[in-house]
């Protein structure tokens, strides 16, 4: 005898079990939206493998598996992003000789600049990018990049003139 499960049976099963499964999935993730996504993914996975809708233990195990997969994926993504950020920071950060007093002053002055000006200044001087390339990288126009660069230079000049 063949066990035929209709689309309607799956809808009824989902509507009955989803609230409890979302609550179960919620213990693994921070948001209800993530928990709902996990339950939906688990139902799809469960349905594709043609498991019996009566096997609720396996359905909960599938929800747990999907949740743990999501957590592992998020950890791997965070690790990759942190490594990429470190690589970018090392490749774009200006290198100062902190034994040299003038360079130490320059480093301090650059650190005092607003972030928008500092990133343009670093990209222009230390990484030798054009204003067009800077604009593309930061999602701003090249004129805005040039303007921020001018403001940064003016602020540095003002800082050094006042120290003399």
Residue ranges of predicted features:
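DNA-recognition helix of helix-turn-helix
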Residues: 68, 138-162
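A short pre-motif secondary-structure segment
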Residues: 120-124
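Arg/Lys-rich amphipathic alpha helix in sigma70-family domain 2
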Residues: 54, 64-83, 99
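Short amphipathic alpha-helical boundary/capping segments
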Residues: 12, 105-113
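Structural recognition of an alpha-helix C-terminal capping motif at a helix-to-coil junction
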Residues: 37-44, 48, 54-65
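A short, charge-rich alpha-helical start-of-domain segment used by transcription regulators
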Residues: 1-23, 33, 47, 53, ...
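Internal acidic/polar
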Residues: 77-107, 130
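C-terminal flanking helix
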Residues: 18, 22, 43, 114, ...
């Amino acid at each position: 005898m063949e066990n035929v499960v209709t689309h309607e049976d799956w809808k009824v099963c989902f509507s009955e079990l989803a609230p409890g499964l979302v609550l179960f999935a919620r213990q693994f993730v921070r948001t209800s939206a993530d928990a709902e996504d996990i339950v939906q993914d688990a139902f799809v996975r469960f349905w594709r493998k043609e498991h019996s809708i009566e096997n609720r233990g396996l359905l909960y195990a599938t929800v747990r598996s999907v949740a743990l997969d999501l957590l592992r994926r998020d950890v791997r993504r965070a690790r990759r992003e942190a490594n990429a950020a470190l690589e970018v920071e090392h490749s774009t950060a200006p290198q100062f000789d902190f034994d040299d007093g003038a360079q130490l002053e320059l480093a301090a002055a650059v650190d005092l600049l607003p972030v928008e000006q500092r990133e343009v200044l670093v990209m222009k001087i230390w990484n030798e990018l054009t204003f067009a390339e800077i604009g593309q990288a930061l999602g701003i126009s090249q004129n805005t990049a040039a303007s921020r660069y001018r403001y940064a230079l003016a602020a540095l000049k003002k800082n050094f003139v006042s120290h003399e």
